[in-house]
Amino acid sequence: RNFPPIIKNLIIINVLCWLASITLPRAFNIDIVELFGLHYWGSEAFKPYQFITYMFLHDTSSVGHLFFNMFGLWMFGKDIELFWGRNKFLIFYFFTGIGAGIIQELVWHIDLSRAAEAFNMYASTKDITLLKPYLTNLTEHTYIPIGRLMELKEQILSSAVTVGASGALFGILLAFAMI
């Protein structure tokens, strides 16, 4: 009763992914977050599978992020899984996690499309003031070659990455409040 199978397996998968996120970059130079974290759709780093894989990744700078996410999953998810059943709970978990990813993409689109537009406008007008919100150390006499401009634009677009299943966890909290 304390660890229904879906909750137990989700916790195991999340812990294994967290450990892989720590060890693989050091041992094999494989950046799990870069590959499987959710990137902005306008970035070259975006892949559709990231809507699912990002839910199993967590901040590696401290174990606290992982612990509190998994504690919340266990604390509230176990009762929902027992009440709804395995399949309904798992569908709900993925639905809320993917939904949170879609909302994150919409927020990024609002933010990052402005940056992309500013870079494109600079390419045609050479008005450096357009880039001041996005780049530091610019003067009115700064000139950025087009090739470098495109590199900077991609760096900004690909810098946005999300990890963790906070959306799924908030969905579980909502469901818990409803039952």
Show where each model-derived region lies.
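A detector for small-residue-rich transmembrane helices and their helix-helix packing motifs
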Residues: 1-179
